[in-house]
Amino acid sequence: MADYLISGGTSYVPDDGLTAQQLFNCGDGLTYNDFLILPGYIDFTADQVDLTSALTKKITLKTPLVSSPMDTVTEAGMAIAMALTGGIGFIHHNCTPEFQANEVRKVKKYEQGFITDPVVLSPRDRVRDVFEAKARHGFCGIPITDTGRMGSHLVGIISSRDIDFLKEEEHDRLLGEIMTKREDLVVAPAGITLKEANEILQRSKKGKLPIVNENDELVAIIARTDLKKNRDYPLASKDAKKQLLCGAAIGTHEDDKYRLDLLSQAGVDVVVLDSSQGNSIFQINMIKYIKEKYPSIQVIGGNVVTAAQAKNLIDAGVDALRVGMGSGSICITQEVLACGRPQATAVYKVSEYARRFGVPVIADGGIQNVGHIAKALALGASTVMMGSLLAATTEAPGEYFFSDGIRLKKYRGMGSLDAMDKHLSSQNRYFSEADKIKVAQGVSGAVQDKGSIHKFVPYLIAGIQHSCQDIGAKSLTQVRAMMYSGELKFEKRTSSAQVEGGVHSLHSYEKRLF
């Protein structure tokens, strides 16, 4: 910090605060509320802060935010919203393998560059087939080829405008009678770049642009809606095919290999091995199996809270580590099993070890506010996984209900008896599938409505950027570098200091965050 002194009157600056090493090597287990980060020098605006972070060895996100694979947090709607806002969502596995794979497929199909496997119909199909496709896939701009398959002669396209006002008795009409014919279509030649194709699509004012080869056979299609999504969501997390990134959770049992096969077919980018205690022979064997059979899929191991746990998973070949045990708002593992670790200490200790091997860390659990996110990232985590913070958003699974005039959504731990009763996957996560008596490691509850992810996540992003600005770092990479070098200083908080740091001495107040 002394490098940034601008007053010329004195050069003496007393040593102030503790380094991360001093703070966490005292033997105490610390949570995020037990310390603060001391401010630095500001010479830039908050919007200049770069939040780019590594999720795994090969996947980088523009924002360090991840949604937890819980059945009251992440299904396709949440995963799409998280990816559009720069993060990623992990589809839970407290469901059938087919349902989970279909949720992944929804995310991957939501936005694409060149769509090489679109829904295709033939002129002999009927209007009702279009409505069925629309109900199943959410769209009805469907190319028509002579055989109803990709790679055959393009003869037309069917859009919502062609069928909007058809009466129910007309649903048996052949598509060849009502489709927009080939001679009225705007098409682009195979080999065109995505940028050039998008320019043609813009000029044409059409909803879809078929891509055809020299024989007028359909080879791909691009959609106008994807152009609008590119404009509206510049931070979106995408793969090489311009599809949204999507993760999914799996277990470590033999039948999870079938689940993995379906997820791979659906296009999943990364899987997290979902276990409350990841340092097991079952997880080590599963990591090796995935890396051998599906080397392109990134694997996140966990959960771990010590360097010794992390070592075994790193040696097995994980691409990232998930850190946290018993720190979640609905988790009672520490209380029931007497195992776990305060989250701030766990994040620092595992991150400090894993960085030597280039393995990113995901801080999972204990996040109550945007300040906790900033602290987790400052302690070495590359990304932060959130459950309760994202529960009860519009995109979270479940229906809203009212209690005492407050709009709520259900939220439960995957170790709760409620979740274990729903599907075997929750029992597997806690090694309880063979137990006659279940030991709950989580609870069920309710969380107040937070509105849409598209408003809430931008608030979190702005909060992290302002935190980095106060620290004096223009990127999260710089924050971590300052922490490991000892330049970033911390200070422990007494219980009185924590009270002082919150709202106090008011008769009444309204706490609006965004």
From Swiss-Prot:
Its main location: cytoplasm. The keyword Metal-binding applies. Keywords: Acetylation, CBS domain, Cytoplasm, DNA-binding, GMP biosynthesis, Isopeptide bond, Metal-binding, NAD, Nucleus, Oxidoreductase, Phosphoprotein, Potassium, Purine biosynthesis, Repeat, RNA-binding, Ubl conjugation. SUPFAM superfamilies: Inosine monophosphate dehydrogenase (IMPDH). Residues 114-173, 179-237 form the CBS domain. IMP binds at residues 329, 364-366, 387-388, 411-415, 441. K(+) binds at residues 326, 328, 331, 500-502. It holds the Pfam family CBS. Transmembrane segments: none annotated. The modification N6-acetyllysine is found at residue 511. One of its GO terms (molecular function) is metal ion binding. Pathway: Purine metabolism; XMP biosynthesis via de novo pathway; XMP from IMP: step 1/1. SMART domains: CBS, IMPDH. Acetylated by CLOCK in a circadian manner. It is found in: Cytoplasm; Nucleus; Cytoplasm, Cytosol. Coiled coil: none annotated. Its EC number is 1.1.1.205. The keyword Disulfide bond does not apply. PANTHER family: INOSINE-5'-MONOPHOSPHATE DEHYDROGENASE 2, INOSINE-5-MONOPHOSPHATE DEHYDROGENASE RELATED. HAMAP family: IMPDH. This is Inosine-5'-monophosphate dehydrogenase 2. It comes from Bos taurus (Bovine).
